[in-house]
Amino acid sequence: MTPFEFRQAVRHRDFRGPTAGHCGDYAQANLAILPAAHAHDFLRFCHANPKPCPLLGVGEPGDFRVPVLGRDIDIRTDVPAYNVYRDGELSERVESIETLWQDDFVVFAIGCSFSFEHMLAKEGIGLRHVEEGRNVPMYRTTIANRRAGVFGGELVVSMRPLRGADAIRAVQITSRFPGVHGAPVHIGDPAELGIADLARPEFGDAVTIRAGELPVYWACGVTPQTALMAAKLPLAIAHAPGHMLMTDITNASLAIF
């Protein structure tokens, strides 16, 4: 299935699940959608926090197409699920934002680690959440983001359990793709990130960690949602964690070496 066909399936509500493992050669995007009055500060926030917030594209005010991301994209309908934030609180999860769209909304598309998972799989590195049919586990750390205007919050990380040799190889592979979070930010003890219990992720689903495996953590594109919470905007929208926008951008084009 091509990214265009995948987006059409989402648009017509034929697909509603997590997007990990789909259209493996193409980049997936996290989304943050907010009023234009706050767009400059959010852009500064992304530039100040490039590890969790690598930008793939930014729309014009009121533009729900964002053509730099792909053909015939409609941001309002082409994501399997959206989180709606009101005054910094998660208000609802919806399957379309057509009725919520505002003429001053600006779309920020942020790189996603699902994009490099295909590269890991091709090298024989197993992905537990894919094997178990679950959403990747994501954790809110105690590491503060660099602030920009009203945007702050804490770093969110995704976690994949790997054997030592696979963890080393994963560092080598993902370092080539800073546009989709790059190399891990931590390997090992979750307490060093302020994570109390790996069995209780704030976002996504817990996965099995087997004997001899290390938890490997990547900066995560759910991080902007902690910034939206901290900003307490009257209305802001993001993708539901694990439910991404499929783009026409090839993963190969994002490699820096």
Swiss-Prot record:
Belongs to the D-glutamate cyclase family. It comes from Paraburkholderia phymatum (strain DSM 17167 / CIP 108236 / LMG 21445 / STM815) (Burkholderia phymatum). It is an enzyme of class 4 (lyase). NCBIfam families: PRK05463.1. Pfam families: D-Glu_cyclase (PF07286). Its EC number is 4.2.1.-. InterPro entries: D-Glu_cyclase, Putative_hydro-lyase, UPF0317. Keywords: Lyase. One of its GO terms (molecular function) is lyase activity. This is Putative hydro-lyase Bphy_2364.
